[in-house]
């Protein structure tokens, strides 16, 4: 028998399939190219349609976005706010019924009553009708309590009503953004209202104005003699009309305002005018005072080698029959910067303290201790500038004296 021929597999190979797929892709691309070449206007329609109607910003209220209008509606306040819940809504009906049963009248019996051995029918209305017996006091008290509780509940739930009528607007407050500045400094710079607001912001209670003693005397300071002292004297009138003056009191304070010397002087002549309204001296004060010569010697010893401060201090030295170097005297009445500040040629001590120290002195009877303290406080405020001016003044004088008129010296003959 002849051998049967084996049929070869007629299925295409992998390379043949790949070539067929590539040919199909190429034909698709070619078709697309031909289509777009023949129909060029169709592709450009979308771009033209976009450019035909450019977007412009809205000019009239009708053109605004609906979303914007909806947002405006939401922002408007609601006209009908939700009504507050009544006290009856807070508690369920079951609880109310239970409370009514507890506090109300007793319910009638369910069983029908017997009359003469027979049973009478009772309607439901008659069974539910409350008894006409007068309520007891305890029940009335409970009912009154309930009414009060309900009234209080409704008052708490109702929102507070705003007072009708035009209310006056509060005055605008000063905007103080700094909180590390002393309220006293703010008050001095911006006024009392700004100082008050600064104290409120910092939680500081407004204190009373400082007394003269706190301003003029330094607390816990040295109480002995210092290189600079201030002196003041009080005088009484002697003679026929009391016009002539005599020493009655001498007071000396140190640099810190501490009193180091204060003595009354026994008069050597008959006093005709004590000048109590001004000097504060009374007969009992000088009756047992020190002798004038003793006081004079003690004061001279204190002033020796020290700088003397005072107000019109030349009058005090004159009444004591003492002298002091002009270079070591600091008179607050003659200091030019003080004169310019208060705009006065001969300012009083009272005026200087009121304008510069913001303290009132000599409001009634004068006190020599307080006057000396005030003069010393004025000096310590201007001590640096005052001493620099004195130093420059006397340095120029000494330099001028040192130069002097010089004669031209001829050279010696040889």
From Swiss-Prot:
User: Where are the residues of the annotated region Disordered?
Assistant: 1-174
Where is the protein found, in the record's own terms? Nucleus
Tell me where in this chain the Exonuclease domain is found.
228-379
Which keywords, in A-to-Z order, does the entry hold?
Answer: Exonuclease, Hydrolase, Nuclease, Nucleus
Name-wise, this protein is RNA exonuclease 4
Q: Can you name the source organism?
A: Xenopus tropicalis (Western clawed frog)
Q: Which family does it belong to?
A: Belongs to the REXO4 family.
Gene of origin?
rexo4
State if Cytoplasm is listed as a keyword: no
Q: Which InterPro entries match?
A: Exonuclease_RNaseT/DNA_pol3 (IPR013520), REX4_DEDDh_dom (IPR037431), REXO1/3/4-like (IPR047021), RNaseH-like_sf (IPR012337), RNaseH_sf (IPR036397)
């Amino acid at each position: 028998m002849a051998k049967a021929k084996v049929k070869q597999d007629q299925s295409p190979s992998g390379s043949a399939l790949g070539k067929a797929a590539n040919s199909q892709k190429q034909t698709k691309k070619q078709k697309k190219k031909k289509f777009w070449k023949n129909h060029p206007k169709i592709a450009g329609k979308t771009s033209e349609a976009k450019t035909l109607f450019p977007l412009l910003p809205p000019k009239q209220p009708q053109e605004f976005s609906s979303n914007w209008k909806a947002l405006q509606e939401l922002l408007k306040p609601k006209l009908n706010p939700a009504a507050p819940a009544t006290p009856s809504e807070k508690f369920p009906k079951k609880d109310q019924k239970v409370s009514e049963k507890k506090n109300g009248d007793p319910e009638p019996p369910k069983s029908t009553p017997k009359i003469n051995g027979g049973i009478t029918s009772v309607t439901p209305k008659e069974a539910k009708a409350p008894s006409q017996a007068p309520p007891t006091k305890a029940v009335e008290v409970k009912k009154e309590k309930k009414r009060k509780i309900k009234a209080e509940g409704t008052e708490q739930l109702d929102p507070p009503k705003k007072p009708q009528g035009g209310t006056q607007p509060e005055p605008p407050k000063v905007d103080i953004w700094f909180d590390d500045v002393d309220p006293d400094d703010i008050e001095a710079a911006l006024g009392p209202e700004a100082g008050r607001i600064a104290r409120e912001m910092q939680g500081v209670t407004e204190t009373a104005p400082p007394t003269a003693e706190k301003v003029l005397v330094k607390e816990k300071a040295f109480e002995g003699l210092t290189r600079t002292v201030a002196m003041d004297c009080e005088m009484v009138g002697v003679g026929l009309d009391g016009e002539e003056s005599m020493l009655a009191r001498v007071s000396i304070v140190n640099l810190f305002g501490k009193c180091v010397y204060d003595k009354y002087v026994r008069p050597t002549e008959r006093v005709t005018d004590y000048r109590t309204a001004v000097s504060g001296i009374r007969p009992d004060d000088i009756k047992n005072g020190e002798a004038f010569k003793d006081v004079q010697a003690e004061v001279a010893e204190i002033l020796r080698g020290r700088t003397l401060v005072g107000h019109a201090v030349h009058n005090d030295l004159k009444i004591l029959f003492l002298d002091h170097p002009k270079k070591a005297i600091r008179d607050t009445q003659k200091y030019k910067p003080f004169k310019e500040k208060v705009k006065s040629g001969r300012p009083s001590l009272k005026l200087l303290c009121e304008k510069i120290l913001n303290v009132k002195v000599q409001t009634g009877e004068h006190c020599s201790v307080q006057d000396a303290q005030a003069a010393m406080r004025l000096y310590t405020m201007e001590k640096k500038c005052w001493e620099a001016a004195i130093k420059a003044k006397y340095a120029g004088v000494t330099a001028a004296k040192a130069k002097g008129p010089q004669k031209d010296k001829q050279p010696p003959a040889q």
